[in-house]
Structures are given as structure tokens and as C-alpha cells.
Amino acid sequence: MRKRPQQQRAKVIVDTILEATQICIAEYGLMQVTTPKIAEKSGVSVGSIYQYFENKDQIILELLRRKSENLGLALKQMAMVKEQIELKALIDMSLQFGFDVMREDNGFFIEVLKYWHGYNNSEAAEILEKHFLEVGLYVFNRFYPHWSFETLKNKSFVIINS
């Protein structure tokens, strides 16, 4: 971001820009999103958008960063709240969670996944990898406590990156 918002009003403007960007991606597709379309959907002028973001790609990267953080936290919460659940049920729930996320927000994540190769080195990808690794370590440690930490870490890494 060009300028991190400090005041509440500025934070609301940035949130509005990001919400409009998400809607535009779901509505027009990732490659057809433009700053003028974001401005129109958000009700924020193009000039005001450029006070906070250098370009459309920076807006999208910030949106993906935030969505990835929220997705990772939701997955962690789901995995850690269900302490008494069996492994198979947890796997089923995790898969259903993934499908549900894909359907949310008018297919926003489906559209992003089509072009994920362009974002796989982004901060958003790093955030997701960190959360998935932590969930993997938690689950493996819970169901396979006899495995060493290195084994857990390596198996989690292989599964996450497969």
C-alpha cells in the first residue's frame, strides 16, 4: 500500500475500496478489473484510490492478503475447536470447508485460483502456507504424537504443497 490509513475514516475508505474490488473480481473476472470499475463500485474517486494504492495490482494484493489471513484463521479455528472429533471427520469437515469457501462471495476465490500462479509468491500465499502448516502440525501432533517434530514439519510441508 502506498499509504497505510491511520484515521478511522481513511480505514473505512480502504475497506470500501477492497470490498468493491472483491465484487468487481467476482463480477467481471480478475483480468477485466480496472481501477475505474473499482471506483464506480466503491463510490470512491480514482484519485482517492491512488492516495492509498499505486495501481490495481496493489489493491488486489492487499485484498488477497486480508482474505488469506481471514481464511487461514477460520481454518485454524475449525480444526482446533473440534478437539473430540476423529481424524476422518476432521478431514471431511476440512474438505467441506474448502468447498464452502469456494462458493462464498459469488465465486471470488474460484476466480482468483484461475490465476493463482501469478500470486503464488505473494504475501497472501505466504500467509496461507503459514496457517496451513500450523494447522497441519497441530493435527498431526494431535493424532500422531509419537512422530518427531521434524517428521511432522516435513509431512505437513509435502501435503500443503501437493
Residue ranges and their predicted role:
Residues 69, 73-75, 89-96, 100-107, ...:
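Amphipathic alpha-helical packing segments from all-alpha helical-bundle domains
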Residues 6, 148-160:
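Membrane-interface starts of transmembrane alpha-helices
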Residues 12, 16, 24-58, 62:
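Helix-turn-helix
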Residues 17-25, 67, 71, 98:
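Short hydrophobic clusters on alpha-helical segments that form packing/core surfaces
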Residues 2-6, 53, 80-84, 118-122:
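A short, mixed-charge helix-start or loop-turn motif at secondary-structure junctions
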Residues 1-12, 146-147:
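N-terminal intrinsically disordered/low-complexity leader segments
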